[in-house]
C-alpha cells in the first residue's frame, strides 16, 4: 500500500481558503486512485511542511507519484471558489 503524507505548517494553513485541504485530498484521490487503487492519504498541519511517499514498488513509481502531486499542486482548478 502506498502511503502519502502531506503536512503544511500552521502559518501556511492560516492563509488558505476554507475547504482547500479537503479539495486537495479529493483531487489527489481522484487522480492517483486509477493508477494506484490502494493508497493511504493524510493531509494535515505539522510543525514544518513536508511531503512523504512510502510503499512504492520502486523509485520510478515514487518519482511518478511525486510528479503527479506536483502537477496537482500547480494546477489550481481544484481550489475552492472564493
From Swiss-Prot:
Similarity annotation: Belongs to the DinI family.
Xref: Gene3D superfamilies: DinI-like
A GO BP entry: DNA repair
One Pfam family recorded for the sequence: DinI
UniProt organism field: Salmonella typhimurium
UniProt protein name: Protein ImpC
Stated role: The imp operon is involved in UV protection and mutation, however the ImpC protein is not essential for these functions.
InterPro entries attached to this UniProt entry: DinI-like_sf, DNA_damage-inducible_DinI-like
Taxonomic path: Bacteria, Pseudomonadati, Pseudomonadota, Gammaproteobacteria, Enterobacterales
Record keywords, A-Z: DNA damage, DNA repair, Plasmid
Domain of life, per lineage: Bacteria
Transmembrane segments: none
